[in-house]
Amino acid sequence: MTATVELAGGTSGLQHASRPRKPKIDCFYVYPTVSGQPGVNANLHIDPEETVVAQNQASRFSQTCRVFAPMYRQLTTTGILGKPTKAQQALAYKGVLAAWHDYLKHSNKHRGVVLIGHSQGAFVLDRLVKTEVDRRPAERKRLVSALLIGGNIQVPVGKTVGGDFKHVPACTRGSQIGCVVGYSTFDTTPPANALFGIGTATRQILCVNPASLRI
């Protein structure tokens, strides 16, 4: 897939993604809220919305890894704007959890894996890391990194570990593995009632700029 890349100095250029024959790692991608289906939870029919967002967000990673992008019964745009029950929220997570277990059992084969999620995908993967990866040394060993964008990952103020995850730290170096990149972007200062980027007195929302990480 062709992509426009913004270069230093304000110029831009086209890059064509090339897929390696034998990528050394995997990527497990969970797409954001895109379903416009009626109802609170989407069904598992692949609509154009899922295809387009997966191509736009995940295809670039195919230059480095095998991409696994499971369908799941996400909360739809209607569901997000309403008041979904805990059971409806759990239904979205249940599908991703089942896909993760299937991936580990049949496809991982002890390979390193990058977790990638945006918006609702990041929230779902936050829970997956918290309940699965963070608790299991074998799974933490496979984690290359977790890119959880717009997911309100919490850490204690001034700390890089703790909060949402007890063992998986924030990434602070480009060469670091087993860590998490998280941030939410705003074009202005977020209001006090913003859904993203607002911490508490003791916890802050993780903000790692991957472009600033140095090896």
Please tell me what each predicted stretch does.
Residues 1-15:
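Basic, amphipathic N-terminal segments that precede the first structured/catalytic domain
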Residues 20, 29-112:
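Active-site catalytic motif of lipid deacylating hydrolases and related acyltransferases
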Residues 26-30, 68-71, 114-115, 145-148, ...:
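Structural recognition of the beta-strand scaffold that forms the well-ordered cores
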Residues 54, 125-133:
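Short, well-ordered amphipathic alpha-helices
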Residues 76-79, 123, 153-157:
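Short, well-ordered, mixed-charge alpha-helical segments that flank or form enzyme active sites
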Residues 95-109, 130-215:
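Surface cap/lid and interfacial helix-loop subdomains adjacent to catalytic sites
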Residues 117-121, 125:
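Gly/Ala-rich beta-loop-alpha elbow adjacent to hydrolase catalytic centers
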